[in-house]
Amino acid sequence: MIDKTAVIHPSSIVEEGAVIGAGVHIGPFCFVGSQVEIGAGTELKSHVVVNGITKIGCDNQIYQFASIGEANQDLKYAGEPTRVEIGDRNRIRESVSIHRGTVQGGGLTKVGSDNLLMINAHIAHDCIIGDRCILANNATLGGHVEIDDFAIIGGMTAIHQFCVIGAHVMVGGCSGVAQDVPPFVIAQGNHATPFGINIEGLKRRGFDKESLHAIRNAYKLLYRSGRTLDEVKPEIAELAEQHSAVQAFIDFFARSTRGIIR
């Protein structure tokens, strides 16, 4: 179904069965598959491919040569009906690729809302991206990677499959991330190591001085006490009881499967 207010360039192909919302604009030489749903106000600039079982929300801007919903690169993938879901108000720049999920990984690759995916960024199968994240040019995510809200991934950075990147993290450019990065941390290098707390980012997002101080203290316990994670967890948990912002560390530790960067 194509809404009567949608504008589709005559050179583009929209297969029968696709759902195209109000005010959608599809520029020249695009392809939209039969199982695609595109929400109101979204624009495909030109030469965009959206295929597979893909649902795109409202008011997204998708630039030329982006590829969304194509088959993933997992060698086990055998054409199962897996999906891609994208939220609202994302900016998906030139040559970004977002692959559909795998059965083994839950069948879904998901991108939230208000994200900026810069030129040539790659989101592999089964990745989960939160809201208000930035993936800079040529950032590459392996399969099953999770990126929490407000994280920034620098240009030319590669993240190993199954890694978790916590909220408000900043990963510097040209880094290689092979383990999980706790929330609020700045990471840099190959392999990436911690370089303190993303203080400026947290200030911009409204964290008060008391919360920043508590987060710093949790970081010091984690990285400067000379003790193991298991040894400092109880003290960080005590700190979280007094300062809610620190709870993000405790929740993150429960999710981590690859160990945290050191």
Curated annotation (Swiss-Prot):
Q: Which GO terms describe its biological process?
A: lipid A biosynthetic process
Cross-referenced PROSITE patterns: HEXAPEP_TRANSFERASES
Ligase among the record's keywords? no
The record's InterPro entries line, in alphabetical order, gives: Acetyltransf_C, Acetyltransf_C_sf, Hexapep, Hexapep_transf_CS, Lipid_A_LpxA, Trimer_LpxA-like_sf
**Keyword flag Acyltransferase:** yes
Q: Where in the cell is it found?
A: Cytoplasm
User: Belongs to which family?
Assistant: Belongs to the transferase hexapeptide repeat family. LpxA subfamily.
Q: How does it assemble?
A: Homotrimer.
Q: What is this protein called?
A: Acyl-[acyl-carrier-protein]--UDP-N-acetylglucosamine O-acyltransferase
